[in-house]
Amino acid sequence: VGVVCRYLRDTFQCRGAVPVHPPLLFPPSDEYGEESNIVRLLDKTGNVVFLPFDLTVPFARICARSGHMRLKRFDIADVYRENLLAGGQPRAVLAASYDIISQEPDPSAEAEVLALMYELLQMPGLAGEAWNVELSHESILRVFLQRFPAQFHSALLEALPQYLARGSDARVRHLLGSAGMPVSLLDEVDAWNIYEDFDTAVHTLAELLTPEERTKLAEPLAHLVSVVRLAREFSVQSKIYLVPLFSHSHTHYRNGTMMAVSKMSSGGKHRDVLAVGGRYDELLRRFSYPRIGSSQEPRHGVGLQIAVGKMVKAVARYQQSHVPRFLGRPEQERTLGPWTPRRCECYIASSQPGLLESKIQICKTLWSNGISADLQYECAAGESPEVTVSTCRAEGILFLILLRAHTSAVKVKEVITRTEHEVAREGLTTFLQDRIARQRRVDQMTVGVRPRESDTQRLSTSLKGGYHSNIK
């Protein structure tokens, strides 16, 4: 989890985003409609408050009431679901969010988010899977719904996610049929179930539209065309699918672009969503304070929420299948891979008790030179080196430093290559810096996409305090 979160943080910061974390609790909101999994709590005054169900709505609320007109932000935090067990603690799900706030509804913002999606899909584990980048517009969904009597709208919105996974599957048709929808309207839904490359899908959709509908959708479709064109400028090379029946969190993105990364699993019967987002200008407007004259310009926002847990599972699968192969390489090319969690780079131990002070001194020296290290306490001193090496390998530690009595030299065991070196204490720091740098170069040559920082690098200055948000 830590490796993936660091990679996401570095990716977001590379684009100029700063960390902004909204308050944990916020007042009840109608934005979630009839959602039953929201965690509702009582504060000390007896008022109902919500835990975050997603990362978009809480941020939109504080952003709409702040002075920010131009901002890129990110957040990596838990969102919460009601526990099915009565009285059980809310279920926490780790998510990441990337948002762009601007003064104009520029399609460049959506294009940049699509580029971010594309880059994330190059990660090991995700790159080998059939993830698709999907694009739509909330106006297309509304035009579709207007073709049906209002009494069927709720049933349609409930069935559309399943429709995207199963097409005209009999079970989905039965769901709509049980709501009283006639066969002619079911065929209409089938006709709109388009899932094609963007340019092809635009032509297919145009053939279904009436002249009045073409007029309504001319501007939204032109906006989507600009988004796709600019996404290509951002070097997005994958197919972008136009999905008219896209309805995920559509209430957040009213009159705006909607996008997602998904794949089909279980033989096409299940649609697995990795990320979802879109343009939420209307959400910002609804949360804004009432405008007095022209004192406050409208804000425009585009955001993406990512299921971090699914990324973690994908990377774990990749590591499980590839690490044995990495370790089977020639000695100078062996690696655990850049995605292996690494507790620290060095572990300082001794072959006998009584050397704790020396271990502390070496540990302090390594820390002061930016090398992450841990030391063995007296209770474990004298432990078998084989057992210690095995523990280091399981924790991703690169070097085991063994101290011995009556000698100024230490023994350094390289955990990956299983080689040993006799190193004088005064030259230990230089030796380790050289070996760590060499190991990082080997790690970086292992795969094309990798974390931008080592697992042990501390948080950057911007996270420590280089940026001070004035959002309240």
Language-model regions: role of each:
Residues 134, 149, 153, 165, ...:
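Intrinsic-disorder-associated interaction segments
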